[in-house]
């Protein structure tokens, strides 16, 4: 944690930058920040919100940029640390789900990095940590910074690019996600890929492009069948590639990804008119019934995959069943998706589960939601991570009955 002196020093530096940028005197910067020229810096080093806003205006930065610059923890690097051991530590953090530890280690890697490749690897590790926390808007700049480094090995550049595509996909930036994934696919289209990392990049790129195009069918329903027809070959290619990877490397995570592609293809085949909605729902229900007790089901990629099957089921029901047939199957899928999202602490699944349940209630006119404190925490966290969801989140809060303990915090809808 930063000391008072550290915080004051960093704040003073930003004020000086703003003064130089604007060509202002100390008196002029004080006036712009609505502060006394003799006491620009608070004793604690912690600026109030109006000072952060004033600095952002003076610097032509965003408020978030100023807050991040002021709030970033000092990086502690000891003499015995080296990049190779730190990278191994970051990988271990990823495998164990220690996302904050991964970000901390990535920052130490960045502090020690002296080459473009080392900086790019550190950026990729930091992005992975933010991805794990569902903070995709914070993973994006790290991936973009990594890709801005010159002379990177092709494999590393491809990995950064496909991770960038996935971050955009998670944020519903479908134009960007399709463009970045296409870059990877086109680069590898005319060659035999043998090394494992590049095989994974190609499989993942097809998954992201296919999934992005599948989502585009929901946003552009008039051309939904056309988008679904474009999505299916990518999802098929990704499924086959992940099945091959699972067999070659005996890694069940790849089999789970193949399973997610298989479920997504059911949704697009309904959109294409190649499968009836009721047949698709029956197949999806039978599949997700394998997860009887979410709380005691092993966490991991397979459980997440079944969570996405629930979302595919919701999509089929919402877009292809008569309204009177919605309630029961929709509730099965949305409730199961929410349980899995909570079990895995998966923010992308939470966003979809909340959105699907809201859509169901809008159509059926069911009684308002009843949200307890845990539900509210999940909802607020989802609103912060997905700007496109924020309006829906406020709608839920406004209409829900909130179960808040006596003396607890109040919010809209309470």
List PLM regions with ranges.
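TPR-adjacent "capping" and linker segments in tetratricopeptide-repeat scaffold/adaptor proteins
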Residues: 2-6, 68-85, 113-114
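Short alpha-helical DNA-recognition segment
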Residues: 20-42
């Amino acid at each position: 944690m930063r000391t008072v002196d550290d915080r004051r020093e960093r704040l003073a530096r930003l004020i000086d930058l703003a003064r130089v940028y604007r060509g202002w005197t100390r008196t002029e910067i004080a006036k712009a920040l609505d502060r006394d020229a003799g006491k620009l810096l608070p004793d604690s080093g912690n600026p109030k919100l109006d000072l952060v806003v004033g600095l952002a205006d003076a610097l032509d930065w965003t408020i978030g940029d100023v807050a991040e610059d002021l709030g970033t923890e000092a990086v502690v690097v000891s003499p015995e640390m080296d990049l190779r051991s730190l990278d191994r530590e970051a990988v271990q953090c990823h495998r164990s789900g220690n996302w904050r530890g991964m970000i901390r280690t990535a920052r130490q890697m960045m502090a020690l990095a002296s080459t473009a490749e080392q900086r790019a690897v550190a950026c990729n590790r930091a992005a992975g940590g933010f991805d794990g926390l569902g903070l995709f808007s914070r993973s994006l700049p790290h991936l973009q910074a990594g890709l801005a480094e010159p002379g990177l090995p092709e494999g590393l550049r491809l990995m950064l690019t496909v991770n960038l595509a996935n971050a955009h996909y998670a944020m519903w930036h479908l134009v960007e996600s399709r463009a970045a994934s296409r870059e990877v696919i086109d680069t590898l289209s005319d060659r035999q890929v043998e090394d494992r990392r590049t095989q994974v990049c190609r499989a993942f790129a097809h998954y992201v492009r296919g999934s992005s195009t599948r989502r585009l069918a929901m946003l552009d329903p008039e051309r939904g069948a056309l988008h679904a027809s474009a999505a299916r070959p990518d999802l098929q290619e990704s499924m086959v590639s992940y099945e091959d990877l699972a067999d070659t490397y005996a890694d069940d995570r790849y089999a789970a990804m193949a399973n997610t592609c298989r479920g997504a293809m059911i949704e697009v085949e309904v959109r294409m008119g190649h499968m009836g909605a009721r047949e698709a729902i029956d197949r999806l229900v039978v599949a997700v019934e394998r997860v009887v007790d979410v709380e005691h089901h092993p966490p991991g990629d397979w459980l997440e995959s079944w969570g996405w099957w629930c979302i595919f089921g919701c999509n089929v029901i919402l877009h292809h069943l008569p309204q009177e047939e919605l309630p029961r199957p929709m509730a099965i899928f949305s409730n199961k998706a929410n349980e899995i999202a909570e079990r895995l602490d998966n923010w992308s699944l939470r966003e979809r589960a909340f959105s699907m349940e809201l859509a169901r209630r809008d159509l059926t006119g069911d009684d308002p939601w009843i949200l307890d404190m845990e539900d509210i925490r999940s909802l607020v966290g989802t609103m912060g991570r997905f700007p496109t969801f924020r309006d829906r989140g406020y709608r839920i809060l406004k209409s829900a009955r909130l179960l808040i303990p006596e003396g607890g915090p109040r919010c809209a809808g309470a």
